[in-house]
């Protein structure tokens, strides 16, 4: 194994406290050397909470605060990757506050990444959705031992996000029926551009992708952990709509905003949590499996936090305080990176259009050529049929005399 290998975690969070405390600690205890946090305009207890968490982890935890900039996730991620200054010996693991890595007992992602060859620039892993209880309290650590239900997604679903959103809103499809896309861990050492959500490595395009077996490494994802978090997501969806993001960007949160606007969010929660009274309206329920792997994986993290000087009960009393920019130039830097991204995406889109138009023109010419060949073949068939007909043979002398008279 490469002794100089480092694994650096990166999480972008907005109003994610106290869950963020748990996910950062879980990553630092088990899998990564450092965690960088981009606190994006949080207005809850995130700022004070991160300061207290930094007292525990010291230099292993770095915080960048950003305020007043739209949620340009790809540009923000690229900025932090530049600040990290990762080398080719480093791997970047981008995770969300509601994601927790699961490995077989006693193993770390470090061992797996250490065996990945130099030709691989990214490592792909699977993400499974977990289902929460109807009255879940994120501040009560004892309740995490109840999270044993893993959603069984229907992998035959491959529909556009707008159709998925409409079907879920109507209740004909359950949110947990939809598979969550796999994600990638990427190698450092150069300009890196990750898609939103870290589902795809856009740059560099060179290099192969290594795929991890889910038995060795997967992530437990809690998209709907509590009713309080559900309302936060709906509020974030409203922000995305107001800022003019397309419907596919954060489509889940935009869908929750629409459900909230029509008074259907409470019924949605009943159909997507365990132990709630029956939903008020028709709707499908998720397929589930009893799985203790998350409970087993999170137990050491809960024990560690229980032994720290900062008691988790303080999470209830942290005052909401907007997080200002850590760096004066952070907003400008992200704006500049975003502009570069827009230009790059526009160039790529134009190239795609040109290729598509060329392909369409080639297809059109091939179709026209096919029609002409078919017409020529039909004409030749008719000519041969006429030449072999009895009337044609009987009138051959007459045609010969006619040619002589000319």
Task: Spell out what each predicted region is.
Residues 33-44, 64-66:
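Short beta-strand/loop segment that forms part of the nucleotide-sugar
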Residues 33, 90, 121:
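Short acidic/polar active-site loop segments enriched in Thr and Asp
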Residues 96-100:
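The conserved acidic donor/metal-binding loop of glycosyltransferases
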Residues 25-34:
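Short, acidic, metal-binding catalytic loop of nucleotide-sugar glycosyltransferases
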Residues 310-406:
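Boundary detector for helix-to-coil junctions that initiate low-complexity/charged tails
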Residues 49-94:
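Active-site-proximal specificity loops/subdomain of glycosyltransferases
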